[in-house]
Amino acid sequence: MPLFATPFAQLDLIRQPEQDGEPLQAFDAADEYLLNHLYERGVTAQSRILVLNDAFGALAASLAPHVQLTSSGDSHLGFLALRKNLARNGLDLGSVRFVPASETAVGPFDHVLVKVPKTLALLEEQLIRLHGQLAPGAQVVAAGMVKHLPRAAGDLLERYIGPMHASLAVKKARLLVAEAAERPAPRSPYPTRYRLEQPPLTLLNHANVFCREGLDIGTRAFLPHLPRSLGALRAADLGCGNGVLGIAYALLNPQAELTLVDESYMAVQSARENWRAALGERPAAFRADDGLAGQAAGSLDLVLCNPPFHQQQVVGDFLAWRMFLQARDALAAGGELWIVGNRHLGYHAKLKRLFRGVEQVAANPKFVILKAGK
């Protein structure tokens, strides 16, 4: 892999999760454009800089030795990538203060560098939270590859930060540069809520939760077929989102012990709040993690999963395959993984390579529900 070279540093960077023969870089031309722009503006060791949505730590690792740096994002994998890339390049892990996107990064900040996320609701919430955190004369610069940079991103900068102009494209990347101006304190439209009829739940969704406006169709297909009356099993909702699968399963299985895990901090925050609303003080574990990587081997009896098929802008089944491997390792002998997936993804064949037996629980023209026994 090529080194990431800018006026600030020359770095050897990796993506997370790692895979053999990784074809993709841990940085892009938008990262380079942002850092070149900041270098031209000039920074000192006293400059207070906030980086948002730094996918694999390219921005933070470049700036860490030079400024007072805070990084914030909603991906725990992004946090792990930042730590690994700092260590990989001999940089102090304490040189970057990391704040999960479920919390507000406290300023004041002189410069804010933003990688525009796929979910514009996350960008909107992040810009809203910048109110009162910007130093006088601060500049907020958002960047992305032109093909992934919607016009609405510039509109959000204008609304919440101040006058904005778009740069020329360089290497198919573009900057959106906003100068901080007086704006009235905004009211956030997040979290959103929607009502589920069966089971009867009102589900809260923070800004970066998948399908925050309504139940996704895969989960809708899965819910009627969740196993019930299984006793005191140890179960996990893997990639829990707002927690709906885990909560619905818990309602059907009053003695079950639940763990809800997602790599999104906002998802875990949503799941925790939804659990309390539905189940009160019933114990459960909530964890932002790299799937079940932190789960002890053989410590679960059941894993429920509606696996994702994309990481940021990259589509594929790598993450799903990794979740299946993690579930197999975390399950005790005789334990089961239950999943829902699009028919065309061929999960049945993939699960057969990992598990003792695979059965189809239910299906419709678009989705299939499978259970795989260890």
Swiss-Prot record:
One of its GO terms (molecular function) is nucleic acid binding. It catalyses: guanosine(1835) in 23S rRNA + S-adenosyl-L-methionine = N(2)-methylguanosine(1835) in 23S rRNA + S-adenosyl-L-homocysteine + H(+). Signal peptide: none annotated. The keyword Protease does not apply. Its EC number is 2.1.1.174. Pfam families: MTS (PF05175). InterPro entries: DNA_methylase_N6_adenine_CS, rRNA_m2G-MeTrfase_RlmG, RsmC/RlmG, SAM-dependent_MTases_sf, Small_mtfrase_dom. It is an enzyme of class 2 (transferase). It is found in: Cytoplasm. GO terms for cellular component: cytoplasm. Gene3D superfamilies: Vaccinia Virus protein VP39 (3.40.50.150). Its main location: cytoplasm. It comes from the Bacteria. Keywords: Cytoplasm, Methyltransferase, rRNA processing, S-adenosyl-L-methionine, Transferase. Specifically methylates the guanine in position 1835 (m2G1835) of 23S rRNA. Belongs to the methyltransferase superfamily. RlmG family. HAMAP family: 23SrRNA_methyltr_G. This is Ribosomal RNA large subunit methyltransferase G. It comes from Pseudomonas paraeruginosa (strain DSM 24068 / PA7) (Pseudomonas aeruginosa (strain PA7)).
